[in-house]
């Protein structure tokens, strides 16, 4: 089957936003207008097509980013709906990795909220061109222009409106298109019919002012246009559109549109903007990777003729077909039933069927081409972030980095029958989600699950019960503390057993030193002259890694340190890998204890929104939780307090805030960084762990 849409008529976009800005509703409307869905699904009825997990329909939030495909004005648009809740930022990170452009949805009342900042920074990191859509223009308190200035101030972006609203709140009737300088007035409720008329008189001045700002921004994209603009010549509609596209692709400007997705206003112009201003796969640089054989950089041009390469960006357990791997094709083409090479794992895999996903139903296709996003059935060893490619032309595309979990709970199966099922369920769920980890507590033997927040773990447990029918008891959430060292030290580990039979002998001398936060663990081998045979070096490294899992102070994992192996000795007969592993472990324990060890705790960035009269109370409470206030600002009649608070002090904060503010306060928090725990609190943690 030949390619349906040429590459320049393909758009891979994400829809990203803060929770509740109306992202899923916007996607639903897009699917409705592009003819993919015959009846509009409403999020608050639990019937939205994109939110297809039961948990999502109950909670009215989007958890997994469903990929779906639709068509508009002769273009294929692949949409990835990303979750806006902070516990699921890993999904957003994954999606941005495989997108070419994005639509950032903002609420016209809330403006730029904390999660919008996080998502925006993630998009900046990957250099994703964006257009902004200020939604919910029909809500009380809607203010388009405040939204635009917040994008400028809080996100440091360059927002340029290409539309302005006609009316606001319940008077929101349509939009003024600043490119054509015409008004679009919506006539019916479904928003399918609209009248194009002259701009209402009361808006003529403001439309002219914003048109001028648009022309100025467009002129900056091109010298010729700049000359024309400065000489006072009119720019043609085509020149304006080309200028907007050029600046958007270079991430120099963010075109801003407005509408009310729920009331079906403004969605078709948004689709037009996606097609006109966001990049096709050919507009972005060729993808870079590393040749696993030579270790040298390799490039794949965006073309069906190039060797096949693709990145698996999401794995999902599907009740009907088993494991589904979502992937983005960067070069070449792929037929179902063919073999591919997983260069990340070094294994060959067979692609069973290839499915094109529409939010919750699927269509089987024979072939996928460069720029497509699809899902494959039958990949056994592939996990998130793996590269699949042509075996004759191997390449590893850059993978993704995921944050460490900050919270964990103990979980126990209710019955013996649940025990085996639970292990399988947790294994499957951790394959899908790299920020969810499972481990066993060495002392108690309990299974520990870790994740990005309370909601994240609640949903995991919920899915385990629904999808895998596992009943489990869940403990109280615990903070994922870490340990690190603050100074250098030298230490040795000597393990000698020479009593009857075969002896054991391992001896290692190490230097241990702190690294900057987030650097992880580094092992440097400086053994010279064969004082320790080469084959025993990895055993010492493994011994240190294992010992670092349970730190010297309170048994928490030790992070951010470098060990240099400087000396040691061995015995011709008695030395073994086991002996050197134990020697490495002993050396680490002695070294870490000498190197001024400390406990680290996760610190959260917190933003609390409260009516003014509760402000003093809320600030006092944050201070009493060892918090640091960073700043305050007023939004309408409410005040926003921003600060940093240790996660251990935030358990149960939701209930507390509700009772302090009579249910009128709201807060969001996200992981920021790790900080050293004050000594008096560290002593309490150590005493509790040692029981």
Swiss-Prot record:
Domain tr-type G: 8-282
Any one Gene Ontology molecular-function term assigned to this protein's record: GTPase activity
Protein name: Elongation factor G
PANTHER family cross-referenced by the UniProt entry: RIBOSOME-RELEASING FACTOR 2, MITOCHONDRIAL, TRANSLATION ELONGATION FACTOR G-RELATED
Pfam family, one: GTP_EFTU_D2
Gene3D superfamilies registered for this protein in UniProt: 3.30.230.10, 3.30.70.240, Elongation Factor G (Translational Gtpase), domain 3 (3.30.70.870), P-loop containing nucleotide triphosphate hydrolases (3.40.50.300), Translation factors (2.40.30.10)
Classification via SMART domains: EFG_C (SM00838), EFG_IV (SM00889)
Alphabetized PROSITE patterns for the sequence: G_TR_1 (PS00301), G_TR_2 (PS51722)
Stated role: Catalyzes the GTP-dependent ribosomal translocation step during translation elongation. During this step, the ribosome changes from the pre-translocational (PRE) to the post-translocational (POST) state as the newly formed A-site-bound peptidyl-tRNA and P-site-bound deacylated tRNA move to the P and E sites, respectively. Catalyzes the coordinated movement of the two tRNA molecules, the mRNA and conformational changes in the ribosome.
Taxonomic lineage: Bacteria, Bacillati, Bacillota, Clostridia, Eubacteriales
HAMAP family associated with the record: EF_G_EF_2_B
Family: Belongs to the TRAFAC class translation factor GTPase superfamily. Classic translation factor GTPase family. EF-G/EF-2 subfamily.
């Amino acid at each position: 089957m030949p390619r349906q849409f040429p590459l320049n008529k393909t758009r891979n976009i994400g829809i990203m936003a803060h929770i509740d800005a109306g992202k899923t509703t916007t996607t639903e409307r897009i699917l409705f207008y592009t003819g993919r869905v015959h009846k509009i699904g409403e999020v608050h009825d639990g019937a939205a097509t994109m939110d297809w997990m039961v948990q999502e329909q109950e909670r009215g939030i989007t958890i997994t980013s469903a990929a779906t495909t639709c068509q508009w004005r002769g273009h294929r648009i692949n949409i990835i709906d990303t979750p806006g809740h902070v516990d699921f930022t890993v999904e957003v990170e994954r999606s941005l990795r495989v997108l070419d452009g994005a639509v950032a949805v903002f609420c016209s009342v809330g403006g730029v909220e904390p999660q919008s900042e996080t998502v925006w920074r993630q998009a900046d990191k990957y250099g994703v061109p964006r257009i902004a859509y200020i939604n919910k223009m029909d809500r009380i308190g809607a203010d388009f222009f405040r939204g635009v200035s917040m994008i400028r101030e809080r996100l440091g972006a360059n927002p340029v409106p290409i539309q302005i609203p006609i009316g606001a709140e319940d008077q929101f009737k349509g939009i003024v298109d600043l490119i054509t300088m015409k008004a679009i007035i919506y006539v019916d409720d479904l928003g399918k019919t609209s009248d194009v008329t002259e701009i209402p008189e009361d808006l003529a001045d403001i439309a002219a002012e914003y048109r001028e700002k648009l022309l100025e921004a467009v002129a900056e994209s091109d010298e010729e246009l700049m000359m024309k603009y400065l000489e006072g010549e009119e720019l043609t509609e085509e020149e304006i559109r080309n200028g907007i596209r050029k600046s958007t692709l270079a991430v120099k400007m963010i075109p801003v549109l407005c509408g009310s997705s729920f009331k079906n206003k403004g969605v078709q112009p948004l689709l037009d903007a996606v097609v006109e201003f966001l990049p096709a796969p050919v507009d972005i640089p060729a993808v870079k990777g590393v040749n696993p054989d030579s270790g040298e950089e390799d490039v794949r041009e965006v073309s069906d003729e190039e060797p096949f390469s693709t990145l698996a960006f999401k794995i999902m357990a599907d009740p009907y077909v088993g494991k589904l791997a979502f992937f983005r094709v960067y070069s070449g083409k792929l037929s179902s039933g063919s073999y591919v090479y997983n260069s990340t794992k070094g294994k060959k895999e067979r692609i069973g069927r290839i499915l094109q996903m529409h939010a919750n139903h699927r269509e089987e296709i024979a072939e996928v081409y460069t720029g497509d996003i699809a899902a494959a059935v039958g990949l056994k060893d592939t996990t998130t972030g793996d590269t699949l490619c042509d075996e004759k032309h191997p390449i590893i595309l850059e993978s993704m980095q995921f944050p460490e979990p900050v919270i964990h709970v103990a979980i126990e199966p209710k019955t013996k029958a649940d025990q085996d099922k639970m292990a399988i369920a947790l294994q499957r769920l951790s394959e899908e989600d790299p920020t969810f980890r499972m481990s066993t507590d060495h002392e108690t033997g309990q299974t520990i699950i870790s994740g990005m927040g309370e909601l994240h773990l609640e949903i995991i447990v919920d899915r385990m019960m629904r999808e895998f029918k596992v009943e489990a008891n869940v403990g109280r959430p615990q903070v994922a503390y870490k340990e690190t060292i603050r100074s250098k030290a030298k230490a040795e580990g000597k393990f000698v057993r020479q009593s009857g039979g075969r002896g054991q002998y391992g001896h290692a001398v190490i230097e241990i030193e702190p690294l900057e936060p987030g650097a992880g663990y580094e092992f440097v081998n400086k053994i010279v002259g064969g004082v320790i045979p080469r084959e025993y070096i990895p055993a010492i490294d493994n011994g240190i890694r294992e010992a670092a899992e349970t730190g010297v102070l309170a048994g928490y994992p030790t992070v951010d340190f470098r060990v240099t192996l400087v000396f040691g000795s061995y015995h011709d007969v008695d030395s073994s890998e086991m002996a050197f592993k134990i020697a490495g472990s002993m050396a680490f324990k002695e070294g870490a204890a000498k190197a001024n060890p400390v406990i680290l705790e996760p610190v959260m960035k917190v933003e609390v929104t409260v009516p003014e009269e509760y402000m003093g109370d809320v600030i006092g409470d944050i201070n009493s939780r060892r918090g640091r206030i960073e700043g305050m600002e007023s939004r309408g009649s409410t005040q926003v307090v921003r600060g940093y608070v240790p996660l251990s002090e935030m358990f149960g904060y939701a209930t507390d805030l509700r009772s302090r503010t009579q249910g009128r306060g709201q807060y969001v928090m996200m992981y920021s960084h790790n900080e050293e725990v004050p000594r008096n609190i560290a002593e309490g943690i150590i005493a509790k762990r040692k029981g």
